[in-house]
Amino acid sequence: MTEPLISGTVYPIQMLDKKGNNMTKQALVPVANGSEEMEAVTIIDVLRRAGVAVTVASVSDSKDLKITASRGTYIVADCSIHDCAGKAWDLIALPGGVPGSQHLAESTVLDQLLQTHVKELRLLGAICAAPAVILGEKGLLADKTATCHPQFYQSMKAKEVDTESRVVVDGNCVTSQGPGTAIDFALELVEQLCGVVKREEVASPMVLTTSPTAYY
């Protein structure tokens, strides 16, 4: 039986300035065994629709880049998180899932990347368990209003926990609640990274609706 594989290896055409410098936005999406697949794949897909160069990195110490997501879906990363060490990213976006979020939190390489990323005021996104288990526990939400999966409302260490909003933007930090808000979250990342026009351009062919009655 063939294993179902989701691999992210198609990159957008590079955008170069007049001096030949690469202007394509660069995003890092770390994944681990137990990451939430709907969130991970939605983030990757929507960002790539916007022309963002997305690198999917496994935090596993294994040389095998295949991870098993929270519902048994196999995802093949582009590289190991060790290959990303010391690089600057326009965006780091963290999918949730349990125990995936905990595995991401335990990665020393990812921790170093996150600490530098936050100090440089670069765009940071986290959804579901990730805001609480990763960002909150590392003290990266101490001055932020944020949201997360309802299961973690009481334990999330943030300046303020927003339990009403599907997506919360506070400065350079974007957080969201879970699988059902993943598209909203990913589109907000597109808007923050590439502008509202690009968000609308990406959203239009996705046949999105905000009205439940539209389905009946």
Label the predicted regions.
Residues 60-78:
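N-terminal beta-loop-helix "entrance" segment that forms/cooperates
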Residues 2-6:
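Extreme N-terminal basic, low-complexity initiation segments
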Residues 8-22:
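Short, Lys/Arg-enriched N-terminal segments with co-localized hydrophobic residues
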Residues 24-36, 46-59, 78-79, 84-216:
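Active-site-adjacent pocket-lining segments in enzyme domains
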